[in-house]
Structure formats: structure tokens, C-alpha cells
Amino acid sequence: METYDVLVIGGGPGGSTAARYAAKYGLRTLMIEKRPEIGSPVRCGEGLSKGILNEADIKPDKSFIANEVKGARIYGPSEKRPIILQSEKAGNEVGFVLERDKFDKHLAALAAKAGADVWVKSPALGVIKEDGKVAGAKIRHENNVVEVRAKMVIAADGFESEFGRWAGLKSVILARNDIISALQYRMINIDVDPDYTDFYLGSIAPGGYIWVFPKGEGMANVGIGSSINFIHNRLELKNYLDRFIENHPGLKKGQDIQLVTGGVSVSKVKMPITMPGLMLVGDAARLIDPITGGGIANAIVSGMYAAQVSKEAIESNDYSPQMMGKYEKLVKDRFERKHLRNWVAKEKLAQLSDETLDKLVDIVSEQVLTTISVEAILKAIAEKYPEVVKELEDLI
């Protein structure tokens, strides 16, 4: 049996950040990753804002940054004039295009340098509970089943959120309309603007969008995310993306060198995400932005919060619902209002015709916005064409 102050389950950005901060706080910390290699396979578009790196004290490094972009462009179905967002206004997914596998390894290395132990190829198999408190996990490590006892467990096991479900947190269960099926190619020999990430809305990606994240030197991540309410299987999703590529002048002559698929949660902030001795972070806690589908930044921030509350709980030997509620309050204060608005917008946008989407994009592309958010965009539309946003007025 092994004993730690903090056990972190999952070696993605949220888990590594939680482990790094917990170790920096002087807590004996173990982070486990079920795969043999942290960061592989890559399962996202790889976009991240510059501000999040600064907030989490992560120094930008060329080893994990493939490209720095000026901003983002959002195209309506007709692909005429796009909405252009400068990177400092464009949210958590615009600024850097990462080499995600190298980024994840870098964060894990920071955790190890801070003093955390790291085990790879070590999946959690079950929850250990004592007197109503989560007290650790059973883990397969080096072909043995090991019991790891911990004063606090931080589950950062991604979309599957297995540990939270095993522990009995029903909030992690998702409705169908809150699940996005995603598929992405890494493409080479393409001709796209390296200064902008591009997003395409409409029936080309039902209940979602297509993205092009340029990585420089004729390479980009080209992917699609669509609600499973509209897409019935991965082949159908692939066909939508292939049709888009065939009709895109800068992509149609390119070649794909990698294909990745996965699921993404796009729900409102859901509670509870704790129980005595357990906190969920990142996608395991359903903290993905419902509009963008981006989650790296939110995983990092929630990992920092979880480590902060772990320190306070362990130092005071208090694992009560009231103590765990401090983490939930931090999460709600940071994400709840924005995610609710973006979730409602996501639901409404999925119902709009291509004609209406084009009208919305045309209206916003004419505006000069000081900040970029769902709220700011809707207010800009309402000022000029209030009838267009009548069905969205509850978001403003």
C-alpha cells in the first residue's frame, strides 16, 4: 500500500497542473496516467490563449508552440465576410496553436520538478472509501494491483470521467444534446492563412462547427465537432468533414497524416463535482466551454483551484461538504454564468437555418467590439437588428 497527501488521476493539463501546485504547496503528491505516454494520442484542436499560460505560471516555449496566431475568423455558411477577432479578444482557444503532446509532457515535467511522483501506464481500477469519504484508489501499476491511500483525490480523467461515476457523482452523466462527437485530421501540403484560426458554421457541421488551426509550414489541424443529436456515427461525421475539405481551395490538394476522434462535453456547469475527499477538474467536471468546445484553459484553472482547496483541507484535516464546497464556489464564480449563457446560445444556434446564421455573421462582421463574448455579440446584433435576436434575448 502507498500513502500520499494528494492522488491525481489523469495526466492531462488539469491533472498535471493540480499535481504541480499540490507539490509546490508541500503536499506529497502522486499523479497517475492510464496510457503509457502522457499527451498521446492527441484528441483536440490544440488552441490556447496566451493569458492562461501567464495565469498558471507556464512560460511559453517553442518546444510546445507550433504557431502563434493573430486571431480567429468565424465564417457563416456562405463563407463571405467573416467575423474577425483579434487574439486578445477571442477567448481561451485563440493565441497559440500547440503541439499538444509536447505541451502535456511539459506540464507533467513541471509537476515532477515540483516534487510530484508520476506513474504512467497505471489506470485507476476503483474507488477506496472509508466512513463516507473517498480515501484513495485501486491502481494497476507494473502488472500489480496497488492500493494508494490519499487524503485527497483529484480526478482529472477527461471526458469519460470514470472515477467520478465510480464514486457516485451523477452530475457527470451527460444528456445527448450535451455531447459533441469530434473528428480531426492533421493535414500537410495545404494553403491556409497561418495568422488566423478559422471556424465554419452551418449545415456543413450540424449542431457544431468545422475548424482549421494552422500549425505553420503548410500544416494544420482540420476538424469537425457535431452534436450526437444530429450525427449518428463517426463515418457520417467523417463524410461531412471530407466534403468540406474537397470544396476548400486551400485544403483539397492536401494530405492527412493523422486522424483522431473523440467525444466532448458541452454542458452547463454541473454540480456537485465534489464529495468528501474528492474533487473533479477539467472535462471530468464538465468544464468545457459549450460554444467553443475548448477545455485546456478551464482544466488548468480548475486544477489550480483543486490544489488550493486540497492544501486548505489537508492542513485543517477538514474534508466536510462545507470545505469541498469552497472548490465548487471557485469553479462557479469563474465559469457558471459564462457557461450558462454559452450553453443556451449553443442550443439556440443549433436550431438556426443557414440563412439566419449568415445574417448573424454579416451583422457582427460590421461591428467594432471592444470585447468578444456571446453577450457582446448579441448586444451588437440587437442594436442594429433586434428582430434577429428576439429568440435569443434571454442571453443578453
UniProtKB/Swiss-Prot annotation:
GO terms for cellular component: membrane. Coiled coil: none annotated. Keywords: FAD, Flavoprotein, Lipid biosynthesis, Lipid metabolism, NAD, NADP, Oxidoreductase, Phospholipid biosynthesis, Phospholipid metabolism. It catalyses: 2,3-bis-O-(phytanyl)-sn-glycerol 1-phosphate + 8 NADP(+) = 2,3-bis-O-(geranylgeranyl)-sn-glycerol 1-phosphate + 8 NADPH + 8 H(+); 2,3-bis-O-(phytanyl)-sn-glycerol 1-phosphate + 8 NAD(+) = 2,3-bis-O-(geranylgeranyl)-sn-glycerol 1-phosphate + 8 NADH + 8 H(+); a 2,3-bis-O-phytanyl-sn-glycerol 1-phospholipid + 8 A = a 2,3-bis-O-(geranylgeranyl)-sn-glycerol 1-phospholipid + 8 AH2; CDP-2,3-bis-O-(geranylgeranyl)-sn-glycerol + 8 AH2 = CDP-2,3-bis-O-(phytanyl)-sn-glycerol + 8 A. It is an enzyme of class 1 (oxidoreductase). SUPFAM superfamilies: FAD/NAD(P)-binding domain. Binds 1 FAD per subunit. A 2,3-bis-O-(geranylgeranyl)-sn-glycerol 1-phospholipid binds at K338, V374. Pathway: Membrane lipid metabolism; glycerophospholipid metabolism. Its cofactor is FAD. FAD binds at G14, E33, C44, G45, G47, R100, A124, E162, D283, G295, I296. GO terms for biological process: glycerophospholipid biosynthetic process; membrane lipid biosynthetic process. Its EC number is 1.3.1.101. It comes from the Archaea. GO terms for molecular function: flavin adenine dinucleotide binding; geranylgeranyl reductase activity; NAD binding; NADP binding; oxidoreductase activity, acting on the CH-CH group of donors, NAD or NADP as acceptor. The keyword Iron-sulfur does not apply. Reduction reaction proceeds via syn addition of hydrogen for double bonds. Belongs to the geranylgeranyl reductase family. DGGGPL reductase subfamily. Is involved in the reduction of 2,3-digeranylgeranylglycerophospholipids (unsaturated archaeols) into 2,3-diphytanylglycerophospholipids (saturated archaeols) in the biosynthesis of archaeal membrane lipids. Catalyzes the formation of archaetidic acid (2,3-di-O-phytanyl-sn-glyceryl phosphate) from 2,3-di-O-geranylgeranylglyceryl phosphate (DGGGP) via the hydrogenation of each double bond of the isoprenoid chains. HAMAP family: DGGGPL_reductase (MF_01287). This is Digeranylgeranylglycerophospholipid reductase. It comes from Thermoplasma volcanium (strain ATCC 51530 / DSM 4299 / JCM 9571 / NBRC 15438 / GSS1).
